[in-house]
């Protein structure tokens, strides 16, 4: 059986996993971004708006509410522990398969919700209902792969996720271009591409575990999860085995956090669905996808890796351990003192990792906050051949770049709190998050009425608090100066129809970027060395 993970191994595997996920995001997203740019130029705005906002919102609701809480609870269980492996593994398997019936029930409810609440303009779009049904089916298929995904994540098999999701994204991108641009199938084409994506996930994850079980039975050495699984039956639920109560409680606690996270990540789509035209939805979807590239490239993989690392880097105290310790207090004082010393060292090391990661993300986000607004118009005009020159898409993208700065801090800090908090702390956090989530929706609706699409991004910024881990003052000053100069250049120098003014605007941006990077190197060298030191652990 796989050996329990030490702190150094967890950090090593976590960092390697982060690099695999970041690599997957960069390669796949750049490829899909190029193809999607061609799709956007060739498809009607209304069709793209329905697909990118309404269909994706339906899929997100089904997937989030079905699997997010169970996924987070299961990743906190150590199925490689020698003493408790069998019980833990059975509980994780049984609980992970509950996502399927939950997802089917939610699919029926929310598909009908979208049909009854859609506008007359939307319902008149060709094959709207058929496309909606295809996205519902694809969501259920994706949930079918969830038990194997949870096992792969729990065992820190990041290579498997990188490979499977990479192939799935490539198939989805190629099929989208084929169905939409070549065959001109409209909304049905988006649905078919989504189903191919889900099928690839199912085949990939199940195929990996089935092949390894067959190899284990043939007495072949398997270093990935040595003899953790000996038969195919272990991958499926057993009604004779009960799910651990603590795991169920943890899942229920994370359910409230899933609702909050859904409101945070998809709240703007709810507001757009009820208040914007299909064309307005399309513009926001394009800007959102473009503006959140850094989030998908870098922030999201690091956030997911941190959620897997922190429970193992920071010692957690559960109710069972407390009860066992109370019964043996008089006999194990020396052991407890030693354990407390080890826990203190673990907390120091874990805290150092957290601080360095946060500082790095803040610096990256400041680059986008500083240079994004000044070059958003130019980027959109270059990518989409001036298709959105007469809209507010450029201003919207500029505000989205500022929003990215808030996202950088929120993701990792949220992963830390949710992965190491005790049960009573999670209960308190849940109620606070739910209240904040509904307040956020209220702000989103109000700002959307006042500022249209830009108001949605302003509401998002209010929902996320800044940390006190800010960079050096000179670095901040260089960012502020660059921000002012590039935006003045964008307003008074840049002209979309003038090649000369475009080149001058780009040159100003390059000069400002170089001077900002110079200050980062000079004033944040200590943080850079600490970050390098953490990265070097992956080779040890």
Curated annotation (Swiss-Prot):
> Keyword Zinc: yes or no?
no
Glycosylation positions in this chain: 78, 94, 487
Keywords in UniProt for this one? Answer: Endoplasmic reticulum, Glycoprotein, Membrane, Transmembrane, Transmembrane helix
Where located?
Endoplasmic reticulum membrane
Quick one: a GO cellular component term? endoplasmic reticulum membrane
* Region annotation Disordered: where it falls in the sequence: 321-343
Q: Name one GO biological process term.
A: dolichol-linked oligosaccharide biosynthetic process
Q: What is its main location?
A: endoplasmic reticulum
Looking up InterPro entries in the UniProt record yields:
RFT1
Q: In which pathway does it act?
A: Protein modification; protein glycosylation
Its function, per the record, reads: Intramembrane glycolipid transporter that operates in the biosynthetic pathway of dolichol-linked oligosaccharides, the glycan precursors employed in protein asparagine (N)-glycosylation. The sequential addition of sugars to dolichol pyrophosphate produces dolichol-linked oligosaccharides containing fourteen sugars, including two GlcNAcs, nine mannoses and three glucoses. Once assembled, the oligosaccharide is transferred from the lipid to nascent proteins by oligosaccharyltransferases.
Q: What is this protein called?
A: Man(5)GlcNAc(2)-PP-dolichol translocation protein RFT1
């Amino acid at each position: 059986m796989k050996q329990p993970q030490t702190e150094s191994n967890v950090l090593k595997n976590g960092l390697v996993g982060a690099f695999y996920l970041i690599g997957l995001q960069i390669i796949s997203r750049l490829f899909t971004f190029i193809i999607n740019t061609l799709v956007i130029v060739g498809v009607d705005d209304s069709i793209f708006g329905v697909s990118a906002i309404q269909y994706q919102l339906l899929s997100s609701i089904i997937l989030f509410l079905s699997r997010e809480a169970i996924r987070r609870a299961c990743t906190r269980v150590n199925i490689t522990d020698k003493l408790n492996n069998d019980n833990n593994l059975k509980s994780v398997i049984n609980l992970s398969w509950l996502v399927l019936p939950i997802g089917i029930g939610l699919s029926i409810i929310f598909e009908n919700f979208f049909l009854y609440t859609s506008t007359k303009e939307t319902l008149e779009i060709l094959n709207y209902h058929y496309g909606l049904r295809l996205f519902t089916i694809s969501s259920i298929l994706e949930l079918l792969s969830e038990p194997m995904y949870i096992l792969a994540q729990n065992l820190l098999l990041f290579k498997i996720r990188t490979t499977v999701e990479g192939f799935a994204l490539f198939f989805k991108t190629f099929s989208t271009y084929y169905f939409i641009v070549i065959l001109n199938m409209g909304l049905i084409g988006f649905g078919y591409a989504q189903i191919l994506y889900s099928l690839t996930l199912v085949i990939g994850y199940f195929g990996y575990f089935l092949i390894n079980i067959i190899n284990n039975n043939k007495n072949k050495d398997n270093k990935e999860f040595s003899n953790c699984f000996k038969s195919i039956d272990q991958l499926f639920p057993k009604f004779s085995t009960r799910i651990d109560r603590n795991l169920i409680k943890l899942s229920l606690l994370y359910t409230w956090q899933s609702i909050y996270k859904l409101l945070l990540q998809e709240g703007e789509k709810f507001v757009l669905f009820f208040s914007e035209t299909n064309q307005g939805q399309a513009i926001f979807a394009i800007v959102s996808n473009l503006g959140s590239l850094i989030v998908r490239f870098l922030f999201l993989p690091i956030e997911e890796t941190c959620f897997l690392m922190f429970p193992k880097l920071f010692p957690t105290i559960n109710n069972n351990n407390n009860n066992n310790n109370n019964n043996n207090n008089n006999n194990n004082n020396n052991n407890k003192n030693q354990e407390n010393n080890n826990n203190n060292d673990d907390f120091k090391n874990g805290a150092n990792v957290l601080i360095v990661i946060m500082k790095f993300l803040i610096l990256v986000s400041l680059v986008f906050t500083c240079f994004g607004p000044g070059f958003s118009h130019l980027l959109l005009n270059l990518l989409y051949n001036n298709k959105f020159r007469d809209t507010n898409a450029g201003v919207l993208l500029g505000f989205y770049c500022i929003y990215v700065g808030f996202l950088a801090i929120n993701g990792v800090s949220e992963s830390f709190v949710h992965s190491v908090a005790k049960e009573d702390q999670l209960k308190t956090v849940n109620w606070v998050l739910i209240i904040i989530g509904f307040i956020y929706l209220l702000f989103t609706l109000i700002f959307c009425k006042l500022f249209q699409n830009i108001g949605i991004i302003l509401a998002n910024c209010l929902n996320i608090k800044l940390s006190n881990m800010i960079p050096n003052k000179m670095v901040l000053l260089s960012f502020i100066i660059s921000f002012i100069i590039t935006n003045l250049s964008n307003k008074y120098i840049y002209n979309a129809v003038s090649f000369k003014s475009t080149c001058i605007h780009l040159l100003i941006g390059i000069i400002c970027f170089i001077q900002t990077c110079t200050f980062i190197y000079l004033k944040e060298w200590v943080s850079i060395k600490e970050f390098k030191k953490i990265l070097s652990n992956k080779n040890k």
